Regions:
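Signature of the first transmembrane helix
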Residues: 1-48, 73-87, 137-142, 146, ...
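Alpha-helical transmembrane segments of multi-pass membrane transport and lipid-handling proteins
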Residues: 68-93, 143-147, 271-323, 353-361, ...
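Hydrophobic alpha-helical transmembrane segments
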Residues: 98, 102-105, 132-179, 197, ...
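Interhelical loop/hinge segments that connect adjacent transmembrane helices in multipass membrane
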Residues: 128, 156, 160, 172-213, ...
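Membrane-proximal transmembrane or re-entrant/amphipathic helices at the cytosolic face
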Residues: 387, 392-394, 402, 413-468
């Protein structure tokens, strides 16, 4: 888990540095294509790598069949994207998008090569090997791309180069580390065995992937590609806390929840504690991002990106509900109900798309507000689904949310008043810190008791993550 966060941190830092050299338009050009590449990568795997990990006895035929299947699907998908690239360019009306599409899709095939050797490393619990392959690959990709940006003044082509190198280097690393020699053969029995497990999870991931990237498509179509660039970088910044910390806590708590999910009383107490830890930290953090959005953009990306500020404000507010939604999704997954995950994803994303499309019919200016409404509804749907699996009613969950949301709202109001009243950061930041301490002290008044125990649990989770 920590290796994943470390490599993602390098990628994030590098992308933020690139933003000082590369225009929002170039980032937006890549952003509108993200959905096609991400969906392709989900389809290539089809959940079968998880099956390879799950199976106790695997044969060389299983590995060869999976490798051949992945390569075949990846080539098919690349050819499909290659053929559709002129139509994609016509839809978005972005010059040279067809060429970019053909080049940025190359990692689809490259990533397919690495699935089997990487899965074998995971199955062998060689997490240190995975970390070093990813870490070194990211460093090499960043250094080579950085040289091309600074010395040769590459811009859009530098982004294309980076995404290709970030796929090529790990694939080479996994193959060399495992000394994996692929065989091009396929056995129906192996495919049938591997394909059965994880199909619900895969379909759910596809639905979520389409939805998570659909805003880039709509913004690129109904606004312009520059706005996609602003949106994509704001989204990248918003996901630093909302995704990374949430993934850390949920990822480390998931195995624990799986071990004793039949003891309903213990399970409900544990998920209540996890939510108190996560929400008490993350909700005020997202509200601080809302307040300091413009300053964060200027500091991290530069003044050329200041128009990304309003995107960051709205995405940070939506991020609060995404955190709640993803937490409940982890709980449903830990109960072994991948079928429920699929159906809730279909319902949530269908409603979300309807709301977003309706907002476009009114005005494209309401696009992100529609996304916020859809995020709140999605969180409520996941909460309702969890209430059907456990004696843990929707009202009980809403009460738990309010125990963090209400004090966080007071925290937001006070910090916002301070921000708008004080001009110097030397006074503003210490006062904000004092307000944060008061927020923690007052949490027991709202039902979040034993703060020290909650922080202790959080530290234990972080230590567990380091072992991964």
């Amino acid at each position: 888990m920590m290796s994943k966060i470390s490599t993602q941190g390098i990628q994030l830092l590098f992308m933020l540095l690139l933003a000082r050299y590369i225009s929002p338009t170039d980032f937006g050009t890549i952003g509108v294509l993200t959905v096609f590449i991400t969906i392709s990568n989900v389809l290539i795997d089809s959940g079968m790598s998880a099956s390879l990990i799950k199976e106790k006895d695997i044969t060389s035929d299983d590995c060869s069949s999976l490798f051949t299947f992945n390569i075949s699907i990846s080539i098919l998908l690349y050819c499909l994207i290659y053929a559709c690239s002129p139509f994609i360019e016509g839809y978005f009306q972005i010059e040279t998008l067809s060429r970019v599409c053909k080049l940025i899709a190359i990692p689809i095939i490259v990533n397919a090569i690495s699935i089997v050797p990487k899965t074998l490393l995971v199955k062998a619990l060689k997490f240190n090997a995975i970390f070093w392959v990813q870490f070194i690959s990211q460093l090499l990709s960043c250094v080579i791309t950085g040289i091309c940006v600074v010395i040769y003044e590459w811009r859009l082509d530098a982004l294309i180069l980076y995404y290709n190198l970030a796929a090529i280097f790990p694939s080479i690393g996994y193959v060399l580390w495992m000394k994996y020699i692929p065989q091009f053969k396929i056995k129906k029995q192996s495919i049938r065995k591997l394909f059965g497990f994880g199909i619900f999870n895969t379909l759910s991931n596809i639905v979520d992937t389409i939805y998570e990237n659909i805003l880039s498509i709509f913004i690129g179509k109904y606004l312009n590609v520059t706005q996609v660039g602003y949106y994509s970088q704001a989204k990248r910044l918003e996901e630093v806390p909302s995704r990374s910390i949430t993934d850390l806590i949920c990822g480390t708590s998931f195995p624990l929840l799986c071990t004793n999910n039949e003891d309903t009383g213990w399970y409900i107490r544990k998920i209540t504690q996890i939510q108190h830890v996560l929400y008490s930290i993350m909700i005020p953090a997202m509200m601080l991002i809302m307040i300091y959005a413009k300053d964060i953009i200027s500091l991290v990306l530069g003044d050329n990106w200041v128009q990304a500020g309003p995107y960051l404000v709205l995405l940070a507010f939506a991020g609060i509900w995404v955190i709640i939604e993803n937490t409940n999704r982890t709980f449903i997954k830990s109960l072994g109900r991948a079928d429920i995950m699929l159906w809730t994803s279909i319902i949530k994303r269908t409603l979300g798309i309807i709301i977003i499309v309706f907002s476009l019919l009114v005005s494209s200016a309401y696009l992100l507000y529609a996304y916020i409404i859809a995020s709140i509804i999605a969180a409520l749907i996941n909460a309702y689904a969890l209430s059907r699996l456990l004696p843990y009613s929707l009202m009980q969950q809403l009460k738990l949310w309010s125990q963090s949301l209400v004090p966080a709202c007071f925290f937001y109001i006070v910090c916002a008043v301070l921000y708008n009243s004080i001009d110097t950061y030397f006074v503003l930041l210490p006062l904000t810190g004092i307000v944060g301490i008061l927020y923690i002290i007052t949490l027991p008044l709202f039902g979040v008791t034993d703060i020290r125990q909650l922080l202790k649990e959080f530290l234990l989770m972080a230590k567990s993550a380091k072992k991964c």
